Curated annotation (Swiss-Prot):
Protein name: Acetaldehyde dehydrogenase 1
InterPro entries: Acetaldehyde_dehydrogenase, Acetylaldehyde_DH_C, NAD(P)-bd_dom_sf, Semialdehyde_DH_NAD-bd
Keywords on record: Aromatic hydrocarbons catabolism, NAD, Oxidoreductase
Alphabetical list of Pfam families matching this protein: AcetDehyd-dimer
Catalytic reaction annotation: acetaldehyde + NAD(+) + CoA = acetyl-CoA + NADH + H(+)
Positions annotated to bind NAD(+): S13, G14, N15, I16, S159, A160, G161, P162, G163, T164, R165, A166, N167, N278
């Protein structure tokens, strides 16, 4: 290991972990060395072994018993597993990037609040729906007050593995909270739809924000376009489906004006096909966060 490289372990060997592995292997700042799972037959562990990583199906206990520990951990297991392991990572001095909805540490959306949370020993990537929609809410709320925001994330059923399905309740709670605390809405709501359509549908998200009746719609639209460009820096397949739509106050919208934004996320196809943009935006955001933290770790060594 050179002084310029930060070592990492991936905890979890499912869809998200395997997609993340391919992104970390391309990183100039992070060296993925370990992948840890609990199923010796998992496809993720097989692929990681084939790519030269050290693997184990004996979980976090095995990793923390090694003579050399990673500088960073990326965990994509489930919320309850990460909650149990997080104090052990902290005790060992290992920085953690949490891709579960456990929310042990502060939630991070790279183009919105990454800089404010760089010193946290454990950062949370919220959810795929959160990464795709919270930046849009933030883009609106930096222009006008947003008393209410609602997001609907629709993802292909085949892209949702057992970990995602086990986390559905946490998904809605964590994403709703992120819409408020990071997106800036006074009240937030999140809905996820697992779409069983064949052939599989690309990830699509709808964002509704209540806005003042006299809001500057041009300024809001410009802010949304700037935020989309920021996201595209690390998720090239993120795009608006059409221009933001503005509606006058109505009974349906609770007497408030609203803006509706429709986006889709096409994945890079690193592990799963491009329709699995819900995985891609999580792993791309986690890689972005990890590289910034790795820069911190490297600077501290000098």
């Amino acid at each position: 290991m050179s002084n310029g490289t930060v070592t990492a372990a991936i905890v979890g060997s499912g869809n998200i972990s395997t997609d993340l592995l391919y992104k970390l292997l391309r990183s100039q700042a992070i060296e993925p060395r370990w992948m840890i799972g609990i199923d010796p037959e998992s496809e993720g562990l097989k692929r990681a072994r084939g790519l030269g990583l050290e693997t184990s199906h004996e979980g976090v206990d095995w990793l923390l018993a090694q003579s050399e520990l990673p500088d960073m951990i990326f965990e994509a297991t489930s919320a309850y597993v990460h909650r149990a392991a997080a104090p052990r990572y902290a005790e060992a001095g290992i920085r953690a990037v949490d891709l579960t909805p456990a929310a042990v540490g502060p939630a991070v959306v790279p183009p919105v609040n990454l800089g404010a949370n760089l010193d946290a020993p454990n950062v949370n990537m919220i959810t795929c729906g959160g990464q795709a929609t919270i930046p849009i809410v933030a883009a609106v709320s930096r222009v006008v007050p947003v008393p209410y925001a609602e997001i609907v994330a629709s993802v292909s059923s085949v892209s949702a593995g057992p970990g995602t399905r086990a986390n559905i309740d946490e998904f809605t709670k964590t994403t709703s909270r992120g819409v408020e605390t990071i997106g800036g809405a006074q009240r937030g709501k999140a809905i996820i739809i697992l779409n069983p359509a064949e052939p599989p549908m690309i990830m699509r998200d709808t964002i509704f924000c209540a806005i003042p009746e006299d809001a500057d719609t041009d300024a809001i639209a410009d802010s949304i376009h700037r935020m989309v460009a920021d996201i595209q820096q690390y998720v090239p397949g993120y795009r608006l489906l059409n221009e933001p739509q503005f509606d006058e106050p109505s009974v349906v919208s609770g007497g408030l004006a609203k803006v509706s934004v429709f986006v889709e996320v096409e994945g890079a196809g690193d592990f799963l096909p491009p329709y699995a943009g819900n995985l891609d935006i999580m792993t791309a955001a986690a890689t972005k966060v990890g590289e910034v933290i790795a820069g911190q770790i490297t600077s501290a060594r000098v």
